């Protein structure tokens, strides 16, 4: 089954800005996934939700070059640690205000898979990501043979490396057989349209 996730953000196409605040500037964060969403807090925007108290993410799409404004590839990592801090790098690992320049970032936000952590495992599965400037970032992955293929719900988390604009939520996934039937139906519709012309 093909999983495609679109993150709508005006930041798309602007990686590398604010290079005075961090090496390479602000980049794109990795995409994190889990079978359920358990944000911290009851406020509408979950402003106090962070790596220590929110959803424990179970998979991460580790980007090949988070400062590319065209996209690239990513590696799927299984996040096996008991908490997010064991599995990920946080916003403060990428950005701080130590350069005697006033800056703003959201402390404690999961931003990147930590590929050097002993609690994460590269699954060997790769996907692609593309940037639509001023609009969106699109992640595409073939989930065949992964546990993601068995999820009925899919929670996600994405942010820039500064952690300022966190996008989180949950959606229901169709059954893999339903996706295959839908694809077959659309193919049949395309064939019937061609034949009728």
Annotated model-derived regions:
Residues 174-193:
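A short, hydrophobic C-terminal helix/tail in secreted or cell-surface proteins
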Residues 1-172:
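Surface-exposed extracytoplasmic segments
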Residues 196-197:
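C-terminal outer-membrane/trafficking sorting elements
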